[in-house]
């Protein structure tokens, strides 16, 4: 790409969906300017102008053109900088379809279940919600075994689309485990997924991008009783 190319990312430090864009940019060795947004205060004019429909982060601005929605951004990065780094999406159409399917599963089924359990008021509702979260993780365990084919990641030897989609929530999960003294990723129940999580977070492309677990735990503790908590992620 040309020297005059301008890349800017609007985000919030604690947001898993923003982490997705950051990891993709890192994988593709893309230099960019980062703009921190305060979603609990006044949203910037740039954010409202760049994403007038959803008014949410992340937003990738590439040569003045905004790209919105986290997984859409990841695909855009993969296609735009296709000569840099390994491909994020698989090359075969069927494998790409599977990657998108499981990413939809994470965002449209598993994540809403997790967030409902997090904000549930009664212990009964929390317990039921966490059972459903565990069921989803068992399904993801089976998917990992099938898709990774004995390799380190859902994408095989390298971090791919599903890895970014699910892996972006690992710091949140570990922060809750630490804060609540509860196990979400269980080494005995989902051993392959447990190993994958450790490999993902220790990967050079990830560990300097994701926020500190203790910092996220403190943030959760401060905001989880507020109605706005759900907006954090």
UniProtKB/Swiss-Prot annotation:
Q: What class of enzyme is it?
A: transferase
UniProt catalytic activity: RX + glutathione = an S-substituted glutathione + a halide anion + H(+)
Q: Name one Pfam family in it.
A: GST_C
Which GO biological process entries does UniProt record here?
glutathione metabolic process; toxin catabolic process
Q: What is its EC number?
A: 2.5.1.18
Can you give the residue ranges of the GST N-terminal domain?
5-85
Residue positions binding glutathione: 15-16, 42-43, 56-57, 69-70
List, for all copies, the residue spans of the domain called GST C-terminal. 92-219
PTM annotation (Phosphothreonine): residues: 158
Question: One GO CC term of this entry?
Answer: cytoplasm
**What is an example of a GO molecular function annotated in this UniProt entry?**
glutathione transferase activity
Instruction: Say yes or no: keyword Ribosomal protein present.
Output: no
Predominant cellular place of this UniProt entry's protein: cytoplasm
Alphabetical UniProt keywords: Cytoplasm, Detoxification, Phosphoprotein, Transferase
Question: What is this protein's function per UniProt?
Answer: May be involved in the conjugation of reduced glutathione to a wide number of exogenous and endogenous hydrophobic electrophiles and have a detoxification role against certain herbicides.
Q: Which family does it belong to?
A: Belongs to the GST superfamily. Tau family.
The name this protein carries in UniProt is Glutathione S-transferase U15
Q: Which gene encodes it?
A: GSTU15
